[in-house]
Regions:
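Flexible, surface-exposed loop/linker segments and immediately adjacent secondary-structure boundaries
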Residues: 1-24, 29-146, 150-185
Length: 185
């Protein structure tokens, strides 16, 4: 479902968060993870489960449908099974290993003169990226690397430099208060 949210709103499994022009959204999760959405983005919480006492049940499955985000992974993806975290995009699937990364899905002129496709910048940790076609092409992206995936059938390509896609969220997005012990906020 898609619903309007405000500071302190709870976002449930299946919910889609849409940011408008000049609007950022910061979602905080009960495992300590955080997602900051750029303006004109669409992000869905496909599945989320975190119980501090049951690391084997951890699940964080998200979809970046449109736009861009920065994420800091929480305990899910750092504990028992790092494959329990997954970020789907129209062109690739991302798995993390204790990570801070930016992902931007550019379509049309949403990123100015930058070519359409998925752009990934890893700040800390590493990301395993796989295109979404039947052709299984996987690449491990380390901190300081930049990757581009043009479409679901093209393999991820390491870029020589960071693409010129600005992401400058304000220092504080809404209230910095911690969310409830349940799911994402």
């Amino acid at each position: 479902t898609t619903k309007a949210i405000s500071i302190g709103s709870k976002v449930d499994e299946g919910d889609t968060v849409v940011t408008e022009k000049k609007t950022y959204a910061r979602l905080k999760f009960s495992d300590g993870g955080e997602v900051t959405l750029k303006p004109n983005s669409q992000f869905q919480v496909d599945k989320y489960n975190y119980d501090e006492g049951k690391p084997g049940d951890d699940t964080a499955m998200f979809s970046l449908i449109k736009g861009g985000l920065r994420t800091i992974t929480g305990q899910i993806g750092k504990r028992l099974n790092p494959d329990s975290y997954q970020m789907k995009t129209p062109t690739a699937v991302l798995g993390v290993r204790g990570t801070i990364y930016d992902a931007h899905f550019c379509q049309g002129n949403s990123c100015g003169s930058i070519a359409p496709g998925l752009y990934l910048a890893v700040t800390n940790g590493s990301v395993v990226i796989t295109n979404t076609s039947g052709i299984q092409t996987t690449l491990q992206v380390k901190a300081g690397q930049y990757v581009y995936v043009q479409n679901p059938t093209t393999p991820p390509v390491v870029l020589p430099a960071k693409p010129d896609i600005p992401f400058n969220p304000p220092p504080k997005v809404g209230a910095a208060a911690a969310g409830p012990a349940g799911g994402p906020q």
